[in-house]
């Protein structure tokens, strides 16, 4: 199942956290969710050149707090904070409550899966060979400390008539390990031949160390009825069947 489901969705509450944090009753839940989708869509369109990694939304006490993780905070803020003030007003109108916008810088964009996927998409739109773009991104991530990275591109690669998918991997990407910190990103490249999808998985290590806990559970667990050699012991003899 690790290869089928979304890497972030299966780890929510274990190694990953939600991008939206708020509580709502049944009457308000749908409107809150729709507002979050509109805000994210608007911000990604406005900040297409800012390298936005993710957008976190919180709703404390009839207000809204939006945190934008970006590789280029100067593009988001603008001169003397003019651009971010315009964004704040638009977000407040969409959400219907006073909004505050915080900007967080992504210091290593080469280790952010979403930014890596968008970088590969931009290279493909500039007609750079997909294998070169993949290997360049993989090399940069491994050089900066990633334990593993996998890149998958799908579509009409190099203008081929039949669409196909190719992937490249270095290191380990344990998708079945729930405590693994795996960052996932997806982007689309609009080329003259059609849409090319890019998926990126980056493994950064384990979030929790369960080795000691597992050892204690193993020591405290009751043993089965076996002797030291691992045998199951003597079985009760069955009565012999009478010959017909």
Swiss-Prot record:
**GO molecular function list:** mRNA binding; rRNA binding; structural constituent of ribosome
Here the disulfide bonds are: none
Say yes or no: keyword rRNA-binding present: yes
Q: GO terms for CC? A: cytosolic small ribosomal subunit
* Keyword vocabulary terms for this entry: Ribonucleoprotein, Ribosomal protein, RNA-binding, rRNA-binding
Which spans does this entry mark as compositional bias, Basic and acidic residues?
Answer: 216-244
Give the family from UniProt. Belongs to the universal ribosomal protein uS3 family.
Query: What's its job?
Result: Binds the lower part of the 30S subunit head. Binds mRNA in the 70S ribosome, positioning it for translation.
Q: What protein name applies here?
A: Small ribosomal subunit protein uS3
Report the source organism.
Xanthomonas axonopodis pv. citri (strain 306)
């Amino acid at each position: 199942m690790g290869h089928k489901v979304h890497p972030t969705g299966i780890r929510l509450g274990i190694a990953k956290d939600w991008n939206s944090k708020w509580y709502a009753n049944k009457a308000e839940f749908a409107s809150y969710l729709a507002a979050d989708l509109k805000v994210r869509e608007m911000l990604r369109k406005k900040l297409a050149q800012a390298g936005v990694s993710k957008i976190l939304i919180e709703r404390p006490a009839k207000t809204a707090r939006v945190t934008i993780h970006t590789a280029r905070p100067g593009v988001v803020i603008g001169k003397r904070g003019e651009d971010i003030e315009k964004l704040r007003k638009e977000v407040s109108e969409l959400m219907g409550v006073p909004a505050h916008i915080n900007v967080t810088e992504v210091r290593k964009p080469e280790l952010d899966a979403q930014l890596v996927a968008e970088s590969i998409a931009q290279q493909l739109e500039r007609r750079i060979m997909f294998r070169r773009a993949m290997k360049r991104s993989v090399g940069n991530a491994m050089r900066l400390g990633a334990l593993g990275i996998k890149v998958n591109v799908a579509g009409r690669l190099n203008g081929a008539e039949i669409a196909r998918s190719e992937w490249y991997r270095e290191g380990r990407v344990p998708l079945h390990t729930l405590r693994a910190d795996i960052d996932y990103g997806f982007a689309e490249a609009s080329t003259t031949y059609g849409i090319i999808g890019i998926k990126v998985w980056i493994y950064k290590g384990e979030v929790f160390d369960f080795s000691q806990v597992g050892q204690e559970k193993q020591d405290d667990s009751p043993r089965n009825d076996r002797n030291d050699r691992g045998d199951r012991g003597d079985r009760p003899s069955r009565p012999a069947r009478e010959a017909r």
